[in-house]
Amino acid sequence: MPEDQAGAAMEEASPYSLLDICLNFLTTHLEKFCSARQDGTLCLQEPGVFPQEVADRLLRTMAFHGLLNDGTVGIFRGNQMRLKRACIRKAKISAVAFRKAFCHHKLVELDATGVNADITITDIISGLGSNKWIQQNLQCLVLNSLTLSLEDPYERCFSRLSGLRALSITNVLFYNEDLAEVASLPRLESLDISNTSITDITALLACKDRLKSLTMHHLKCLKMTTTQILDVVRELKHLNHLDISDDKQFTSDIALRLLEQKDILPNLVSLDVSGRKHVTDKAVEAFIQQRPSMQFVGLLATDAGYSEFLTGEGHLKVSGEANETQIAEALKRYSERAFFVREALFHLFSLTHVMEKTKPEILKLVVTGMRNHPMNLPVQLAASACVFNLTKQDLAAGMPVRLLADVTHLLLKAMEHFPNHQQLQKNCLLSLCSDRILQDVPFNRFEAAKLVMQWLCNHEDQNMQRMAVAIISILAAKLSTEQTAQLGTELFIVRQLLQIVKQKTNQNSVDTTLKFTLSALWNLTDESPTTCRHFIENQGLELFMRVLESFPTESSIQQKVLGLLNNIAEVQELHSELMWKDFIDHISSLLHSVEVEVSYFAAGIIAHLISRGEQAWTLSRSQRNSLLDDLHSAILKWPTPECEMVAYRSFNPFFPLLGCFTTPGVQLWAVWAMQHVCSKNPSRYCSMLIEEGGLQHLYNIKDHEHTDPHVQQIAVAILDSLEKHIVRHGRPPPCKKQPQARLN
């Protein structure tokens, strides 16, 4: 692995620096640290002065997160922030705000790529030119993808920046006259005029004794002949870098003609002819051998780069498509050029199809391409396919969490931007359907669940349906009850999932799609009364009775169905909906199942329904008494399960059952359930039980004179476990409970 790529991979695997953590916190909580001026702009409340490097980093961080506007840039007024290298990419600011916030600083670099149309290049240079120090000392200026001026004719003003050494002005309506002005700058050494409106580059002769780097990618308006272009280039004897690459749109032979020249560009160390026609390995090799100092050649989207001489794995770097090294170099160098990013990703996909080794350094390059071109469908399509290949199965386990968080965010953005493109949605779902990502990686799970549900509501692809419900089943367990309720209300999620269950039941089909759908419904209804009501209102109870009757020997199906019905039974307002004789009869028969997982959940339903007293029981009183006896005896017969059968968000649904001293079977089920999870996962559940006040409930059972001996025995055992936990770990402080996925 190249040293720089290895370093990037190590950076992703390392914790965030303290400075990055502080700056990210500051940028996301600006309102806490700032007050507003009378004009509405922000200023920092603390009077201290930021070091220059920190001020630069803060500005770059705000730009990265899209937070720069007329209000927020106010913090860079005055002298608290001392900027030197300013990045305001994609800022949404006015010319007045720019001048007030940035033009009094001693800037040596400014990157204003893609700032909004309210501010023009003329505005920026006029502002910078108002500061004499900047006029003489600004060295690097990036003005890509901007409007030159809103006036016609407009005042040319580049000459004010007499100290400028490097200028990038790509994707701009920049003409020959403008080039002539720029070429006259006395210190100019580096110029990027890619994709501008220039028709003639003869003006470059004015800086032939200074120019060391010239980038002319995709000069689509150029009207010079190849000979005329080469005559100008030949005069630029001090060039170290030349880029004449193109997007494969022209058939010009300029690249081959240049490569055949022997008396040209003697100091060249970097040449880019990517996307050009007629380029051959033989011509490239001959050109490089005549210039032994060459360090880079760009050959992506050409017919060259396949010889041993041009592998790119030695001193000579090569961007191309022949191997992984060349492709990585292309992704690194062309991250701002959508066409080349797509080309590189297309070839990367073929290489990664059979990848067996984790490649975080490659994934990071894919992420950069995705982030830079969020609305470019071909890029997002190719990138999402590569992401799947790079993170599938065990490969994700070796990827840094930070990197996976970035890529997950970008996958969700792609789904949001292109909701109707089936292949893109499929690529994203394939990548998201990963235990590593869904369980370990931080991302907005609520938004993810919404996007996946929207896809599920609009598509019927069977394979993708399985993945979508699998993703939802895990995401649902990670959401708060408020979020699951909102999800159900906004997207009719319960109705859609029930439709899948109905379809599978009608087909008498037990497959992974059915199991994942049942799991999703189970998790969505967990401690969510609103979602439980949606389930009842959409005839879920009748459908689930059919499922139980249709698959009497499928214990995994029965467990999921009964688990959800437990959630319904926990909701007191829905108690009457379950007072249905056929339903109670069927549940009571499952109480005697030989499968402890099935019997356990059947018992839970009965325990909740009986716990509300005789008045709430609207069926036969003798049946209630019989169920109580059966409940008690069934629980005593259960063997100790080898693994954790279930996971709970909290113990709150159990506490009402613990006070049912007149119905010991109800208490017995509750303490058995609590002991089960506390013994299988003590670090989670012992802490949870203590935090939620479970100790007092258990002491009440232990000390009550009418407590059933079996109930008391289990309660004492739980208390013993809790006391040992406190001795080992201390009494846990109150904390937010993290929802956990059920173990299905």
UniProtKB/Swiss-Prot annotation:
LRR repeats lie at residues 185-208, 216-236, 237-261. (Microbial infection) Ubiquitinated; leading to proteasomal degradation in the presence of herpes simplex virus 1/HHV-1. GO terms for cellular component: Cul2-RING ubiquitin ligase complex; cytoplasm. Changing residue 523 to A: Complete loss of N-degron binding. Gene3D superfamilies: Leucine-rich Repeat Variant (1.25.10.10), Ribonuclease Inhibitor (3.80.10.10). Changing residue 526 to A: Complete loss of N-degron binding. SUPFAM superfamilies: ARM repeat (SSF48371), RNI-like (SSF52047). Pfam families: LRR_Zer-1, ZER1-like_2nd. Its main location: cytoplasm. InterPro entries: ARM-like, ARM-type_fold, Leu-rich_rpt, LRR_dom_sf, LRR_Zer-1, ZER1-like_C, Zyg-11_UBL_adapter. Belongs to the zyg-11 family. Serves as substrate adapter subunit in the E3 ubiquitin ligase complex ZYG11B-CUL2-Elongin BC. Acts to target substrates bearing N-terminal degrons for proteasomal degradation with the first four residues of substrates being the key recognition elements. Prefers Nt-Gly but also has the capacity to recognize Nt-Ser, -Ala and -Cys. Involved in the clearance of proteolytic fragments generated by caspase cleavage during apoptosis since N-terminal glycine degrons are strongly enriched at caspase cleavage sites. (Microbial infection) Interacts with SARS-COV-2 protein ORF10. Interacts with ELOC/Elongin C. Part of an E3 ubiquitin ligase complex including ZYG11B, CUL2 and Elongin BC. This is Protein zyg-11 homolog B.
